[in-house]
A protein has these predicted regions:
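Short, flexible loop segments at boundaries between secondary-structure elements
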Residues: 143-160, 288-304
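Small-molecule pocket liners
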Residues: 39, 137, 151-152, 161-163
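Ligand-binding beta-strand-loop-alpha-helix segment within the catalytic cores
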Residues: 155-185
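Contiguous, glycine/small-aliphatic-enriched amphipathic segments in soluble metabolic enzymes
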Residues: 1-138, 177-266, 270-293, 299-301, ...
Length: 334
């Protein structure tokens, strides 16, 4: 990482019974090896104490993080408290994870934190306390005053970035959910995100087809002709560099990846399978279209291994590194 933001990052620990507290603590332990900038952990200190015996220091202002970070993990204590038992999610833990997320987003929105990195949460537990959003992405978007339809989920690694047009949709419903306007909107959000977050002045977006061989001229489906090509044409008319639709099976080898900055894919697995095959340990979830930077490691709570010192901190470290890079790029542009 060549640049760091001027302000610290805010990291929500996620569900206290999951691996979030452990991987954040391990990131602080290995901050030099991972080349991490100062960050503030937000959660219940007891969730750290159950999995880690390192030093932490409570702070009430992110500006204090720089002075603390060298010798202790700076920490914001949340109002909802639940130290939790690793591997045993509770309703109290759901309140804890939601409170930490709320505070992290608030710090970023106020400008006190350069970016938000969100730890993994249990949607099942959140739904049990009345959480009304499909996931953290939609919650963050609402708090930022952005319609969830105007954000995009990017999965990013060192050599590949992918964005699905449709996300958590049953495969049987993908074709009926697609529209030229949706493809165009996701493409535009992606291109703007490549400029703002990644500092790419003239990004190139490669668009996949939906059907085998990108429809084979309409022989294997007409979505490419009726939906995808019009969306590409509209983006090109705005001056963006967009290619496709390309057959998805030839888009992700090394030579193909060198020809674009991000791939816009039609459905969830079309985007996530190549990313996870190539960047399983260091793939990062980046939410595009927000006024703040938000990243997350591409893994869940892993309750089955929580508290056993088995959690790999590399995905969280990658999410922190990417948040710092995106925040620094925005600061330079502003």
């Amino acid at each position: 990482m060549t640049r760091v933001p001027a302000r610290p990052l805010a990291i929500s620990l996620g569900d206290p019974a999951g691996i979030g507290p452990e991987v954040v603590a391990k990131c602080w332990d290995q901050r030099s090896a991972f080349n991490l900038p100062p960050f503030v952990a937000i959660g219940d200190p007891r969730s750290l104490a159950g999995v880690w015996d390192g030093p932490f220091e409570l702070i009430d202002d992110p500006r204090q993080a720089d002075a603390v970070f060298d010798y202790a993990l700076p920490m914001f204590q949340i109002t909802a408290a639940d130290g939790g038992i690793p591997g045993h999610p509770t309703v109290a833990g759901a309140h804890c994870s939601l409170d930490s997320l709320e505070i992290a987003v608030g710090l970023a929105r106020s400008g006190s934190a350069a970016a938000v990195v969100t730890g993994p949460v249990s949607k099942e537990q959140l739904y049990s306390i009345g959480f009304a959003h499909p996931g953290q992405t939609e919650f963050v978007a609402e708090r930022c005053g952005v319609s969830s339809g105007n954000v995009a989920m990017m999965l990013a690694g060192p050599t590949l970035r992918t964005v699905p047009v449709t996300t958590h949709v049953p495969f049987a419903e993908v074709a009926e959910r697609l529209s030229a306007s949706l493809i165009e909107a996701r493409g535009r959000t992606t291109l703007r995100g490549l400029q703002r977050n990644f500092g790419i002045a003239e990004p190139i977006l490669a668009v996949t087809g939906l059907n085998p061989h990108a429809g084979e001229g309409g022989m294997l489906g007409r979505e490419e002709i009726e939906l995808i090509q019009p969306a590409i044409a509209a983006l090109r008319a705005e001056g963006w560099k967009v290619t496709g639709p390309h057959p998805a099976d030839t888009m992700f080898h090394e030579g193909a990846r060198a020809r674009y900055d991000a791939a816009l894919c039609m459905y969830h697995d079309q985007a996530l399978i190549p990313l996870k095959a190539i960047h399983f340990e260091d793939g990062v979830n980046v939410t595009l279209g927000l006024p703040i930077i938000r990243t997350a490691p591409d893994h869940g709570t892993a309750f089955d291994i929580a508290g056993q010192d088995l959690a790999d901190p590399r995905p969280m470290a990658s999410a922190i590194q990417m948040a710092a890079m995106c925040a620094a790029n925005r600061e330079m542009a502003e």
